[in-house]
Amino acid sequence: MNKVIMAAFAAGTLAFAAPAIGQQLPVRGGNFWEVAEITIDDGHFGDYADHLAGAYRKAEDFARSRGWIKEYHILQNVHKRANEPDLYLVTVSDHVATAAEDEAREKEMNAYLASNPRQQESLSGARAKFRHLGGTMLLQELLYR
C-alpha cells in the first residue's frame, strides 16, 4: 500500500515539475543602457554642443576603445513637453561596472585626458551654469530567447 501511495505521489510531483521547464520566460537580460536627462538653458545649446563634440566625445570614444562601453548616443527630445529634458545621453554596456572597475577606469581616463577628479569637477561646475542634469536611469535590454 505504501509503495502505491509513494508511486502516486512521485507521479504527481513529476507531473507538476515537467511544465516548469516549459515556463521559462521568453526573454533574457541583455545590455545595460544608462540614460542621463539633460536640460540646457535657452541660448546655450551651442555651448553644450561644443562640449559634446569635444571633451565628451573624446572620453566616450576612449571608453569604447577600451571596451568599457559598446556604444553611446546623443538623443534630442524633438517634441519636448513641459519639464522634459532637451537631450538624453545614452551609454550602452554589457555589464554594470564594479567599484574596483570604476576606480581603475577613472585613473586610466584621467591619465588619457591629462586631468584629475578636481579638474573634471570644476569643468562640470562651469557647464552647470547652463546645463542641468535632471536624473539618470539604468535600463536593461530584454532579448528574445
In which residue ranges do the predicted regions lie?
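N-terminal, post-signal-peptide region of Sec/Tat-exported proteins
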Residues: 41-88
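N-terminal signal peptide c-region/cleavage motif recognized by signal peptidases
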Residues: 17-19
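Hydrophobic pocket/interface hotspot
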Residues: 36, 48, 89, 99
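Short, solvent-exposed mixed-charge patches
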Residues: 144-145
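Bacterial N-terminal signal peptides that target proteins for export
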Residues: 1-10
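An amphipathic, aromatic/His-enriched active-site/gating alpha helix that lines ligand/cofactor pockets
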Residues: 24-27, 58, 62-70, 84, ...
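Acidic/histidine-rich, surface-exposed loop or edge segments in extracytoplasmic proteins
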Residues: 28-43, 87
